[in-house]
Amino acid sequence: MKGHEPVVYDRASELGGKIRSAIPSSRLPKEVFDHELRRIMGKVTRVKLGEDGITEELFMDIRDRYEYTVIAVGAQNPRELKIKGHEKAVAALGFLRRAKVNDIAVGEKVVVIGAGNVGCDAATEAYRLGAGEVTLIDIQEPASFGKEREAAEASGAKFLWPVAAEAITRKGVVLSSGEVLGADTVIISIGDKPDLGFLPDTIDTADGYIKVDSRYRTADMKVYAIGDSVRPGLITDAIGAGRSVALSIDASFRGVDESYDRLPAIDTARIRLEYYDPGVREFQDIQVCSVACASCGGCRDCGMCETLCPQQAISRRPLQGEGYEYVVNDERCIGCGFCSGACPCGIWELKENDPIG
């Protein structure tokens, strides 16, 4: 959208990462994800899929070929729980991937070691696949929260803490107390870590993650890193980091230095509040609240600018997929400002032309 041409490399046959392959559809409906991906791909036309087995040589080739490189490889390697019989268990990430395509049987009883949000997703999916009893255990108070925790509890999952797993046998999970939790399937959900074996020595790491500054730049000024390759976090964290990096790269191309973390998303003076019903509303369900979002700074495709333009200088142009853009015919535009004055979200901005002569 800033006028640059990004190129995306991905080892999978389809874009989407864990959102497509592992996160349950109950968390993010497939139709919503597909719609958002089509919208994004309306802007990104250069995609190279099936780039499996990235090596340092390939990475350096990419790094040298383009002005900037953004590492967003996520965390795909499950952390190991080094207890006796751990090979009898399945990692949560692998379980969720197979569960999403209904390619795994769970049996009657399931024990999940690790009661974070991913563990809750695994528990909920286990119930969907036919489990009758699911128990999540943790050595400390579970870190799970929000919809994931609520969904697991609503499905019937039990939480036990603080308890520690000593071994995994054919009968189930042996606790440090000697108690055995019977299980047909044991799922280990203690986190994932990124595979950074392709990084050159010029990019610093710490504790298995890429070291970055406040703008997500690595020790190599041409390379940025975001998401779980930097630190464990939420999808929204990765999306926000991606936006910050995009703005930072654009600023570099323009030869300016801007601190986006301290700038508002849009000047509130540009928002036409007369279009909205004012009032303080109590917090409700997140989906209810999201419907009321005015999308300040983002086009809602209302078409008011195109309708009101007295010179018919504005037109809507479809892009690839479900994308679109509104364009101005410079030969028709008279600078009346109707578009800027009518836009509910503050998209249009009038700028003076350079003096002639």
Language model: regions and residue ranges:
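Flanking helices and flexible, charged tails adjoining ferredoxin-like Fe-S electron-transfer domains
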Residues: E5, R20-G42, R46, F59, ...
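FAD-site-proximal beta/loop scaffold in flavoenzymes
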Residues: E87-E108, L181, T185-G240
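Short hydrophobic core segments
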Residues: Y9, Y66-G74, V112-I113, A183-G191
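A conserved FAD-binding loop/helix module that cradles the flavin
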Residues: A122, I226-S259
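Beta1-alpha1 glycine-rich phosphate/pyrophosphate-binding loop at the start
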Residues: M1-G53, R79, K84, A115-K158, ...
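Conserved beta-strand-loop-beta-strand element in the redox core of flavoprotein oxidoreductases
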Residues: L49-T69, I168-V180
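Iron-sulfur cluster-binding cysteine motifs and their immediate structural context
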Residues: V7, R11-E14, L81-K82, F198, ...
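Mid-to-C-terminal Rossmann-like scaffold of FAD/NAD(P)H-dependent oxidoreductases
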Residues: E150, A154-S155, A164-A167, S244, ...
